[in-house]
Amino acid sequence: MAKVAWIGLGVMGYPMAGHIRKKGGHELTVYNRTAAKAQKWAGEFGGNAAATPAEAAKDADFVFCCVGNDNDLRQVTTGPDGAFSTLREGAVFIDNTTASADVARELHAAAKKKGAGFLDAPVSGGQAGAENGVLTVMIGGDEADFRKAEPVIQCFARAATHMGPVGAGQLTKMVNQICIAGLLQGLSEGLHFAQAAGLDIPKAIATISKGAAQSWQMENRWETMTNGKFDHGFAVDWMRKDLGICLDEARRNGANLPVTALVEQFYSEVQRMGGGRWECSSLIKRLEHK
C-alpha cells in the first residue's frame, strides 16, 4: 500500500482519487481549494483532508494533481505552500491536468532538483470515464518514474501509455483535442443539415454509424445534440482553453491547424451566447442561431 496525495477534486479529480482509494486500497490525503469538498471526499472514501498542497504531499510516495490550467498548476506546486516544498526524494508527482508541454518541462526540472520524478499524464474519457475508472492516460516523463507510478494510475485507467520524454503526454493530449474539435464541428454540421433536410435523425444516425462516419462523438452525443441538452460532460470553457494550448504549441512547432483555429473561434461564439459551461458538443447551437 502506497501513501498517495491528491490535489484538485473537481469533476474529474474527485472520482479519480476515489478509485485509487477503493480499487488500490492506498492511503490517501487530499487537498482542494474549497476545503469543504476535501472534507466531503475524506468522509466518503475514508481518507484525510489537508489544509495546503504542501501538507498533502508531505511524506507521500505519489502526488497526483488535477487542476484547471498552467497557472493553477504552478500555484499548487511551486507557489506558497505548494506541494514541491515538501515533495520527498524518490517520490513521483503525476499531473493529470491538461496543460502546456512547457509547464510540464518546467516542473519536471523543478522536481528533479528535489530528487523526485514528474510525469505529465493528461487524460481522455471525460467525466463519465473518470466516474467509471476507464480513462485513457497519455504519459510523458522518465520511463522509471512511469513504471513506478503505473500500478496506481491503473486504478482509474482503461489504458495508461508512456508516450516518451517529459511533455509527450501533453503533446499527445493536444492531438486528441485537435481531432475531437474537428469531429464535433463535422457532427454538428451533419446533424444540422439532416434537420434542415427533414430526415429521420435516429434512422440516419443508425445508418451512417455503421459506415465510415462512425465515431465516439456520434454514438454518444448525437441524441443530446439533437435534443439541445448540454448540461453534462466537458465544458466549452475547458475545450477552448485546451484548443488555445494546441494553437500556442503549433505556433512554436510550425504545424498548420486551420480547422482547429476556426473551431476555437466558434467556441468563443458559444461562450458569447452564454454557453461557457455547456458541454462542448454545443457547437451545434451556433448553427441554429445563424
Residue ranges with predicted function:
Residues 67, 98-178:
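Rossmann-fold dinucleotide-binding core
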Residues 167-290:
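Helical "substrate-binding/catalytic lid" subdomain
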Residues 1-65, 91, 96-97, 127:
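NAD(P)+-binding Rossmann beta1-loop-alpha1 motif at the extreme N-terminus of oxidoreductases
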Residues 53-116:
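Rossmann-fold NAD(P) dinucleotide-binding segment
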Residues 28, 49, 117-119, 160, ...:
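Hydrophobic beta-strand scaffold residues
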Residues 12, 16, 66, 96, ...:
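Methionine-biased hydrophobic packing positions in alpha-helices, especially
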